């Protein structure tokens, strides 16, 4: 079974608005590496549609973009992409797949079928999956910004505090800090896995 890793850009005050992040070569390289290491991407419908509206054009060369962004786009095009949605059934973007029905069952099956791990990049969906205790690791890029507005992580709340263990913290040149935490499990401490190996924004 692969790990489910939640990764997202977040400001110091918890804002996950993608326009508030620092989009430079280091941050794109960070997410490209995570995508390379993981076996699949997992998004909610809103994030999928945001990504679908831009990245396929970059991958085709129809939109201008720096080399780091183009590398990300080409690799994303080839990566299996899974979407949780109760409103939309058709997902024509290359290698896109729909997760329908019971959320716990569908995501657990995806984890079981993806030994390299699944990379989750939707904040609202992450809240739902955390309520189901399905997230194993968290790899956040914490940006040196105070946005003063939402949307924010976990703004709809969790039933209880989530206990995590720090694996590593790596500062980037821009002042962004790459934080890696794993979920604490009472039966065996933290979940297995080291370093940055293992399994990029908003909800359904």
Spell out what each predicted region is.
Residues 1-204:
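Enzymes that bind and transform nitrogen-containing heteroaromatic metabolites
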